[in-house]
Amino acid sequence: MRLSDFDFALPEGLVAQAPVTPRDASRLMVLAPEEGSPAHRGFADLPELLAPGDLLVFNDTRVIPARLLGHKASGGKVELLLCEPLEGGLGRRWRAMGQASKPIREGAVLTFDGLEARVDDVEGEGFYRVTLDRQGPELEAALGRAGRIPLPPYIRRAPDAEDAARYQTIWARAPGSAAAPTAGLHFTEPLLARLAARGIRRTAVTLHVGPGTFLPIRGDDLDLHRMHGERYEVSPAAAAELAATRARGGRIVAVGTTSVRTLESAWRDGAVAAGPGRTELFIRPGHPFHAVDAMVTNFHLPRSTLLVLVCAFGGQGRVLAAYREAVARGYRFFSYGDAMLLLRR
């Protein structure tokens, strides 16, 4: 399977540079199995498009100000992106991406406005393992002072105060992500209330978003691509809610590709298993979906693992045709863009 089969032309002007207000004012393209052509709705219409008894599964990870600009002991400039908490939550040990004018050496001490990071291991390809000089609430305060919201590079502006709130879901709880689970950015409290009033339930899993989600695929042969691991957790309450929904015939509606990967990674012996894990699952056409019946997702980059996942779920030809229609109709793409609802039943 070739990466070039997952390409499409996207005018730069369709890459959303800022979110819409309110959050649920974004557009929603709907791909249903019984309909040949996509339907075009607003995201606020979501309650009408789901059924009582369906279960929405959110990713409750919280984006941290993970981008750090500082210097080495020599005075040379250095940039670090905290990618994966190695101890869970806001611990001291992290996997990070780094860049500097000269190589970053093992044992180097990097300083970021008072926050220090010691380089424990140089993994290669720009990845490092580092130990920070604080953890928990002290680390959260230090990141709030020294860190920046890690907006994706296709948002061609510096992050501002609005991004601190808008590049975060309204239910974000567990700190640890270097990117937002962007399908969740469209939800508002009034929309959640309308969904609940219709009998649509919700639960949450946690996957801390890192390079496994946002790094590009190198080379054209998908069989050679290896995902970077990302940590996830499914609570016993979420696992029970998922099992109960299936037992009564409801649909599992994953909000975002990270929720899809969490649920599919945690599938064991006919059910989603509770507990922590680390996933390197690369979902591509031919993947046998077990845990997910529908998904909400944004419009993704050409030639990305996220687009490959959506094609696996909705059908490669059908999804790429829908993307071409989205371009023709002026849908907004990527993190701050519009959304799709894909239904398998």
Curated annotation (Swiss-Prot):
Keywords: Cytoplasm, Queuosine biosynthesis, S-adenosyl-L-methionine, Transferase. Its main location: cytoplasm. It holds the Pfam family Queuosine_synth. Its EC number is 2.4.99.17. The keyword Kinase does not apply. Monomer. Belongs to the QueA family. Transfers and isomerizes the ribose moiety from AdoMet to the 7-aminomethyl group of 7-deazaguanine (preQ1-tRNA) to give epoxyqueuosine (oQ-tRNA). This is S-adenosylmethionine:tRNA ribosyltransferase-isomerase. It comes from Anaeromyxobacter dehalogenans (strain 2CP-1 / ATCC BAA-258). The gene is queA.
